[in-house]
Design a protein with these regions (language model features):
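Interfacial juxtamembrane loops and adjacent helix segments
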Residues: 1-63, 228-230, 255, 259
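Membrane-interface alpha helices of multi-pass inner-membrane proteins
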Residues: 139-155, 160-165
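Short acidic/glycine- and proline-prone juxtamembrane loop motifs at membrane-interface regions
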Residues: 102-115
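Short helix- or helix-capping micro-motifs
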Residues: 93-98, 125, 147, 151
């Protein structure tokens, strides 16, 4: 998509136009670094009016911003499906994302993140619609195409396929527990035809290319190589990095080397905790699962809910 957008522009001198900082690698991922934080040295060639490579970069940044707008619209309409009689909750949900510093940073950069975020939001909106409305072949096929495009934009899109398959399995419970073998069979062929097949058609060629070229269908081994190779970290060493991952959810800029003031992380972490408390209160309080024509507590159906919910947990 990005290549098609900037195809009319002359970017043949991109390597010469972009002046990389030869000492920039010293600041990558190091928030304590006081110098060499910029990976690119900025010159007057970037000044207005933009031309060539720099015009292409700004067009791609604008494209990322438009994808962010699409994501916000998707969040709003998803919330409207959940709370059709309320306008404040959808606006609040949209505002929480719109004012998230990391969201604004990602959607002002040239990256594949804005596209997969947009497609993931579109897929979640479709799943909510399928939960509330009839499960039709057209809707399932559209969901499969959306997930396929997400998987093509980034490997994390594959997780959407697992999530959607588990979600649709639980959706079958909503229609009742009678004749569950037939329901399971229906879920199986619908998932294969309308979800898995479009994903394979859209993203399968890339996975095959990665397998032939790298011996890894996800090409993850190449990212490991670029990061310095497998350092054989233990599980606890990996978990020790979770604080950095948590901060990156809210505000980590530059090349993972620019942090926001401490109060920013406290504020957004507090909002996340309040949200989790609200979810727990809802689950143990007044939550009921609509099964068939009845509204019942899900506790009575734990033996059926647990195996059907396993794909969601995975």
């Amino acid at each position: 998509l990005s290549a098609a957008l900037i195809a009319p522009l002359d970017t043949s001198r991109a390597r010469e136009a972009v002046w990389l900082n030869p000492f920039g690698t010293q600041g990558i991922g190091n928030a304590a670094a006081l110098v060499n934080r910029n990976q690119v040295i900025h010159t007057t060639a970037e000044a207005w009016p933009w031309r060539g490579t720099f015009l292409a970069a700004h067009l791609l940044r604008l494209f990322a911003t438009l994808l962010g707008l699409g994501t916000l619209l998707g969040i709003y309409h998803s919330a409207r499906l959940l709370w059709p009689q309320r306008f404040d909750i959808p606006l609040l949900a949209t505002a929480l994302v719109a004012f998230l510093p990391q969201f604004n940073f990602q959607h002002a950069a040239v990256s594949n993140d804005p596209l997969i975020i947009f497609l993931s939001t579109a897929a979640l909106w479709q799943l909510i619609w399928l939960w509330q409305g009839p499960v039709t072949a057209r809707r399932l096929l559209l969901l499969g195409i959306t997930i396929g495009l997400a998987a093509l934009s980034k490997n994390a899109g594959v997780l959407l396929l697992l999530f959607a398959a588990g979600f649709l399995a639980v959706r079958r419970l909503k229609d009742g527990l009678n004749n569950w073998p037939k329901q399971l069979a229906t879920w199986g062929w619908q998932t294969a035809v309308y979800l898995l097949l479009p994903v394979l058609l859209l993203a399968g060629w890339l996975w095959w290319h990665n397998w032939q070229l790298y011996g890894d269908w996800t090409a993850t081994n190449q990212f490991i190589r670029l990061a310095g190779g497998d350092r054989e970290f233990t599980l606890w060493q990996v978990l020790a990095e979770s604080s950095g991952l948590w901060r990156s959810l809210f505000a980590v800029f530059g090349w993972f080397n620019l942090l926001a003031p401490a109060w920013v992380y406290w504020l957004w972490s507090g909002l996340a905790v309040v949200g989790l408390v609200g979810i727990v209160r809802w689950v143990i309080g007044d939550w009921r699962l609509v099964i068939g024509t009845r509204t019942e507590s899900p506790i009575a159906h734990l033996p059926s809910l647990i195996p059907h919910s396993l794909p969601l947990l995975l």
